[in-house]
Amino acid sequence: VASGWFEPDPYTDFEVGMGSTVLPTRREIVPEQFLPSSRSVAFLKTAWEEVGGYPEWLDYSEDLVFDFALRERYGDFPFVDTAVAYFRPRGDLTGYFKQYYRYARGDGKANLWPKRHLVRYFTYLVALPYVLRLIWREKWAGWVLLLLGSGVYCQKPAQRLWGNTWGWRPPSRVRAFALIPIIRVVGDVAKMLGYPVGLLWRWRHQDVIRHR
């Protein structure tokens, strides 16, 4: 088993913003801990057979479950820097919403990343209303917290986009940066809607999961 890397191959300004917002750079990952998607993994047929192949009861997130099974059987994957797959990011918010809704639904079905999803619910359903209440009652304190939180929320995408839009005309660059919070919020809402649907499916199909 070996894992490679992937890079966005954008065709439009929107796709540059999308890729910068949702995809990590090579410098941001730890190769030994990286879990490749199906686009950037290579394995022998014997390894595939050893772990039972891709879980057919999953329509999304099946590659992560497959990764975990391979890692449990063979340990950390060798990382091949020169094996790079290029792909085009989603070109509109509708397609992006559907994609991340389905990813989160797959997480729920496979019981993946529960803490990560809980943090997201806490942020939007507890922390954000608290900050908005502060803005209503104590304007300066609320605005300070909102600005600090927004800075942390958008920091990494902004750092990526800064390099990816170097040399652009200022108006185009400003529009690209304005997309970051929109893309992040749309993706988070999609995940918060999709994850409980996956959990409900998992609860209703325990027999299917146990027999896999």
Which residues does each PLM region occupy?
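Short, hinge-like loop/turn segments at secondary-structure boundaries
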Residues: 16-23, 96-98
